Amino acid sequence: MDEIPLLEVRNLNKIYDNGYHADKDISFSLPAGKLVGLIGPNGCGKTTMMRCINRMHEPTSGDILIDGVSVMSQTPAQIARLVSNVPAEMTASFGLTVFETVMLGRYPYLQNMWWETDEDETMVVDTLKKFGVYHLQDRALNMLSSGEKQRVMIAKAYVQNPRLMLVDEPTSHLDMKYKLDVMEYLRAMLKQNMTVLVAEHDISLMARYCDLCIIMKKGELVAIGNPKEVITEDLIRDVYEVEATVGLDRDGEIYVLPKHYAPKNDVFQNP
């Protein structure tokens, strides 16, 4: 008997009221315990698809299943227990502290919205420590650096205990150290047997950390598979309409560079 995918998207279409067809008949499935990169140019439908998966946007047609159950029949509270979200744009914090912000991730489980249990508080404290922001728990979220805010928002999504985490452009505006830190934290999620779907523009970063990559162009799914197999110079040319060199570094990790930046020594080799 075939294993049920953690996430299955069936013939997803999203057409906005102005007639714009953002996602076009998209179908794919993802197993549990995978870090999955979602890449493609601006406007290719990545964010729209993720918003349809968590029902922030209603699909025009198609179905989305988590562990074999359609989210189309789920209430918002039920979906919040299955899917957590780390948005690209930081929403207003309304003066909340780091602790209060992360506690919001527990609200789908509370019997009374404002009555957190000792168990909830312990879970939040443990999560703050896990993500290295425990010392910031009493600080206002809007007083943190971009990297610290990103860790807090990932911690909030983690404490929600979802099956699927959707992360939209988590490394934007971060330096390389924070980018690598964020990706390490996302990989750590996989120990909970959840799947993490990350929309990102840094192709090399996705190729280095992700188990699978989904590539989109103009609302359509172009390819899905192992990064070392699907990320090629031909694909970059077709999807991004630029010339790039795709190769392997001395550690066997993929790099993607514009042609004029490509290294010219034997440390690198084309796959």
Where do the PLM segments sit?
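Conserved ABC transporter NBD signature motif
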Residues: 62-70
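Conserved ABC ATPase signature
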Residues: 114, 140-144
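The feature captures the beta-strand-to-loop junction immediately N-terminal to the Walker
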Residues: 39-41
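ABC ATPase nucleotide-binding domains
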Residues: 239-271
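Catalytic Walker B motif of ABC-type/P-loop ATPase nucleotide-binding domains
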Residues: 165-168
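Helix-to-loop junction immediately C-terminal to a conserved catalytic motif
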Residues: 54
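Conserved structural motif at the start of ABC-family nucleotide-binding domains
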Residues: 7, 22-23
